[in-house]
């Protein structure tokens, strides 16, 4: 890797910047172990990002920290914020998306459904349009998304359901082929697994299409 994937490391946990295209089960732990000069089996995954999605993640380094961070995930004390670039301009420019999602395990895809049944779970997020642009002749929006639930492909499905698939996400209807799925984990907030001090970590997306078409502070 040209730059460090480690953003912060302590005895009980580490925070990394997951590269786009790296899967969480085997490839990312190997990268982290190589950089940390530790064994792969000393790293504990407490949440995941899809292969096509990059950004901030936290990994536990002890069983006790893994249990504590997993508890925070389950109790929604671990807060996740994403940047996304979607086709079209969502209206209103600030709002909430609430859906019932069904995960099709065969197709490895989520679908919004009208009524609850076995396997259906509620999905909730807040979004805010930050900027708009014309990308390859079509309108697109840079959106900040705060997750309140962590459903399978939640952001991808909820935006696509409203006619705004994420750029590069062919699985959910995007026709843009010049990029991978435009979704980035930009901010992670949680409590230190030992001291319980609140922590926040952030990372900007790479300066490649479509992220490089927007102004960043």
Predicted region positions:
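Pseudouridine synthase
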Residues: 18, 28-32, 137-190, 209-210
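Beta-strand secondary-structure signal
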Residues: 83, 98, 126, 142-144, ...
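Short acidic, Gly/Pro-enriched loop/turn segments at secondary-structure junctions
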Residues: 135-136, 194-196
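A late-sequence structural motif
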Residues: 150, 196-199, 204
